[in-house]
């Protein structure tokens, strides 16, 4: 009644690996949800960037991520049919590498285009794993526990993964982000964010590599295209 039968899926190696990697991607999701805004706003203490559009309208800049997310859903049927579920999920993992990497390299001034690319690639990073992952669960589980399995998938990504992501990302940020001496105008300058984003990008790259090596799945065109 409580959906606990879904936990028996951990007895299957492929499903266990899938749920573990789902948790790992949930960590990435929480990193970007929790710290993208503070990162962009931190440029406000630097005179060169204080009056830029990115700093003054950071929420509008970040909203490009949601727009991208909406349009990337339309790409999923094509990519699933062309590349299969495993490769689509791997593309999502690599997209997280670019999401974090563009943050590390960009700035709200001359490098704002890198921020825009980071927002655009978010749609691939989010949709390609969450939607294809849900389809994978639906296909691989018995109808009697399918709903519970979907709940377990959400728990691993938005529950356990999000919790670990919040705690671990905060630990990294507390370690590497620091305040520089105040400027002549009395503004506080925050530094060290780039290091954090490189660490997060490296983490996503390691997860993608491990997924490519250990997660086994054979693409069958007629099953995944619905033909």
Give the residues covered by each predicted segment.
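Loop-to-transmembrane helix entry/capping segments in MFS-fold secondary transporters
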Residues: 55-56, 141-154
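Helix-to-loop junctions at the C-terminal end of transmembrane segments
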Residues: 71-85, 173
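A membrane-interface helix-boundary motif in multi-pass transporters
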Residues: 171-204
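Juxtamembrane intracellular "pre-TM" segments in multi-pass secondary transporters
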Residues: 1-19, 45-46
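Multi-pass alpha-helical transporter architecture, strongest
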Residues: 193-227
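Intracellular juxtamembrane helix-capping segments at the cytosolic ends
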Residues: 128-142
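C-terminal ends and interior cores of transmembrane alpha-helices
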Residues: 95-108
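Short amphipathic helix-loop junctions that connect adjacent transmembrane helices
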Residues: 34-58
């Amino acid at each position: 009644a409580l959906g606990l039968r879904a936990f028996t899926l951990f007895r299957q190696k492929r499903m266990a690996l899938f749920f573990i990697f789902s948790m790992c991607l949930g960590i990435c999701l929480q990193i970007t949800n929790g710290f993208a805004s503070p990162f962009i706003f931190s440029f406000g203490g630097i005179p060169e960037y204080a009056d830029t559009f990115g700093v003054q309208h950071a929420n509008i800049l970040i909203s490009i991520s949601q727009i991208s997310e909406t349009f990337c859903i339309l790409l999923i049927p094509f990519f699933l049919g062309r590349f299969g579920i495993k490769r689509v999920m791997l593309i999502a993992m690599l997209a997280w590498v670019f999401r974090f990497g563009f943050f590390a390299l960009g700035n709200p001034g001359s490098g704002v285009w890198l921020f825009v690319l980071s927002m655009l690639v978010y749609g691939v990073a989010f949709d390609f794993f969450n939607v294809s992952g849900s389809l994978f669960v639906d296909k691989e589980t018995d109808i009697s526990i399918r709903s519970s399995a979907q709940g377990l998938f959400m728990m691993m990504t938005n529950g356990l993964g999000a919790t670990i992501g919040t705690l671990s990302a905060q630990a990294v940020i507390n370690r590497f982000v620091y305040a520089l001496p105040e400027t002549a105008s009395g503004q506080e300058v925050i530094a060290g964010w780039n290091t954090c984003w490189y660490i997060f990008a490296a983490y996503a790259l390691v997860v993608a590599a491990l997924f490519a090596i250990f997660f086994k799945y054979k693409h069958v065109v007629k099953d995944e295209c619905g033909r």
